[in-house]
């Protein structure tokens, strides 16, 4: 089974504001744990975070096809898998993340996954595996596993009862995730969660300052992170 072994925490080992929710940062394909850690100072600078490195290695730290840096990693065996392969990859990665949370985060600490692309799918899939553990979820340019492999999304039958707040944002010019898949993800979330969905004109497979602004407002409205003046 997959296992999360590398984590970057916010200051103080992710324990400076223990009464506020801990953000669980999940990067996209070909990135690493530093990616979303940098983003958090714009989104929720007064909350703690734990940014997890995906366990599948595309390139170790140094120079290579992904440039020079801290390395490139993936949660799945392909950039954008589909069908049964995506179900299996999503379940394996979500289980690895959920296991890490169980081992490393006190049970009474609220946890909010925030992910981009592959990580955005997993921020949703954690709700399809163990929804009771997660206070809310944020999917940025994420997509959805189809749920055709039996047991790969075991909580689908009851997650809607929990009415978990979810923020879902994507660019209207996304060329990585097909637009019908983004629409289908939003539709599934609307049916199964307490959804706020936003789309951004002129934005590709990326995040934007407008999205950060909307996300900050949403976090404040749901009392997840204090508003920023």
Predicted segments with their positions:
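Serine-hydrolase catalytic machinery in alpha/beta-hydrolase-like enzymes
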Residues: 2-107
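Gly/Ala-rich beta-loop-alpha elbow adjacent to hydrolase catalytic centers
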Residues: 115-119, 123
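A conserved short beta-strand
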Residues: 132-144
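Short beta-strand/loop motif that positions the catalytic acidic residue
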Residues: 162, 168-170, 174
């Amino acid at each position: 089974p997959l296992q999360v072994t590398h984590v970057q925490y916010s200051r103080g080992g992710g324990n400076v504001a223990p009464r506020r929710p801990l953000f669980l940062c999940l990067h996209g394909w070909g990135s690493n744990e530093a990616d979303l850690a940098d983003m958090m100072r714009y989104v929720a600078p007064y909350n703690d975070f734990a940014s997890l490195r995906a366990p599948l290695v595309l390139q170790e730290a140094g120079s290579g096809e992904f440039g020079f840096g801290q390395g490139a990693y993936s949660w799945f065996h392909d950039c954008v898998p589909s069908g049964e392969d995506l179900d299996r990859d999503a379940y394996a990665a979500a289980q690895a993340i959920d296991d890490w949370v169980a081992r490393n985060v006190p049970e009474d600490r609220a946890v909010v996954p925030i992910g981009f692309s592959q990580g955005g799918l997993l921020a949703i899939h954690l709700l399809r595996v163990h929804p009771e553990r997660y206070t809310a979820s944020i999917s940025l340019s994420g997509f959805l596993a189809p749920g055709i492999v039996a047991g790969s999304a075991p909580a689908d039958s009851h997650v809607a009862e929990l009415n978990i707040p979810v923020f879902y944002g994507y660019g209207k010019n996304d060329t990585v995730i097909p637009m019908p898949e983004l629409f289908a993800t939003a539709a599934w979330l609307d049916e199964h969660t307490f959804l706020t969905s936003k789309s951004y004109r002129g934005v590709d497979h990326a995040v934007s300052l407008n999205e950060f602004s909307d996300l900050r407002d949403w976090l404040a409205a749901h009392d997840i992170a204090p508003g920023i003046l």
